[in-house]
């Protein structure tokens, strides 16, 4: 017999500390927690093997191909400071292992099987370096930040949004009315909640028609371009496309998709349609916490964000730093920059394990949403800068006088912060003062400040 069968020691073939990574390799950083007694090199090598060419035993067909050319390699292991049994394993994958333009295939290869590995207690994909050669096979976001600003004719400030609540139970006519009030009051966008698809109490077509009416009425009265994220997410790709096509026929500017529950394949199809037909695409990340919340197992959100930029979306929800959902400031800013910028330097303090060059892939606007209100406005404009969408759901609709005054309060607070910044004031330290001054000439803002002055989500 020409080779020895039986379970093999992955370390022999797949741990290659001397390997020099190529510009075309896809690089991954895994946080691996091996079972007691399993050395980290063996665990890292096992991850490299099973997510590329390896199987658990030597097979006859290994002789029919060139493993040296196609195998994943674990080229570095570093201990995690302050944690006993955990290491960061760096793995390089040859580009030929992946289908062009398919986020789906990339994930199936890299995270498809290895997360159930017996030798590991837990495994987390912390970051991916997507090589330029692979980036170039993706269309990416349908339009990107600059084109969106040009379409909306809104410059030099963050955009304002609002999720219509109660998320489930309104009839289409009342839903459209809520949309109109918010847009009329001064918001740029309103949003379907992620779980509003087409339920018995409000079918999608009725909602689309009433929302389109609300958009056009508000546009005519304010002289500003308005939008409502019409959620096209559906049970089948065909139905999703049908909804997107109907939105285009109504002439509205933007549709929305839940990219994790809807799936990357559906999302990429929708993104291509949106670019071909001039629709902006708002992406919601429902289900992300299932994947990214555990510190030692799963996939970090920065990887899901990179994947979305490749698959395509013009906005994506990315945490708030200040509201009700968790997210540490530096880490959040790390993936916010990954979404917006062309080139991001490796910076471990922000959780960025690799330098990422996006070449000319358009950027994505980060959306801050979840438990934020007018008092957060200075912090949000300071943290996220101009290229962002700030979304106040309850922070608009919870206004004691109703939706339109709630929208007015948010718009006034935003404009006050932008003006203060232009005047050179420090938003971080003078934030509360800036908002207080603005309340003097805006009764709507004064009422909002009164309602939310005590609320904090602290756990």
UniProtKB/Swiss-Prot annotation:
Biological process (GO), any one: reductive pentose-phosphate cycle
UniProt-annotated site: Transition state stabilizer, residues: 324
Post-translational modification: The disulfide bond which can form in the large chain dimeric partners within the hexadecamer appears to be associated with oxidative stress and protein turnover.
GO function term, MF aspect, one: ribulose-bisphosphate carboxylase activity
Entry keyword set: Calvin cycle, Carbon dioxide fixation, Chloroplast, Disulfide bond, Lyase, Magnesium, Metal-binding, Methylation, Monooxygenase, Oxidoreductase, Photorespiration, Photosynthesis, Plastid
Keyword Metal-binding among UniProt keywords: yes
GO terms under cellular component: chloroplast
Record: active site: 165, 284
InterPro entries, per the entry: RuBisCO, RuBisCo_large_chain_AS, RuBisCO_lsu_C, RuBisCO_lsu_C_sf, RuBisCO_lsu_fd_N, RuBisCO_lsu_N_sf, RuBisCO_lsuI
Sequence positions that bind Mg(2+): 191, 193-194
SUPFAM superfamilies cross-referenced by the UniProt entry: RuBisCo, C-terminal domain, RuBisCO, large subunit, small (N-terminal) domain
Catalytic activity: 2 (2R)-3-phosphoglycerate + 2 H(+) = D-ribulose 1,5-bisphosphate + CO2 + H2O; D-ribulose 1,5-bisphosphate + O2 = 2-phosphoglycolate + (2R)-3-phosphoglycerate + 2 H(+)
Sites of N6,N6,N6-trimethyllysine modification: 4
Function: RuBisCO catalyzes two reactions: the carboxylation of D-ribulose 1,5-bisphosphate, the primary event in carbon dioxide fixation, as well as the oxidative fragmentation of the pentose substrate in the photorespiration process. Both reactions occur simultaneously and in competition at the same active site.
Other remarks on this protein: The basic functional RuBisCO is composed of a large chain homodimer in a 'head-to-tail' conformation. In form I RuBisCO this homodimer is arranged in a barrel-like tetramer with the small subunits forming a tetrameric 'cap' on each end of the 'barrel'.
PANTHER family referenced in this protein's UniProt entry, alphabetically: RIBULOSE BISPHOSPHATE CARBOXYLASE (PTHR42704), RIBULOSE BISPHOSPHATE CARBOXYLASE LARGE CHAIN (PTHR42704:SF15)
Subunit: Heterohexadecamer of 8 large chains and 8 small chains; disulfide-linked. The disulfide link is formed within the large subunit homodimers.
Family membership: Belongs to the RuBisCO large chain family. Type I subfamily.
Protein name: Ribulose bisphosphate carboxylase large chain
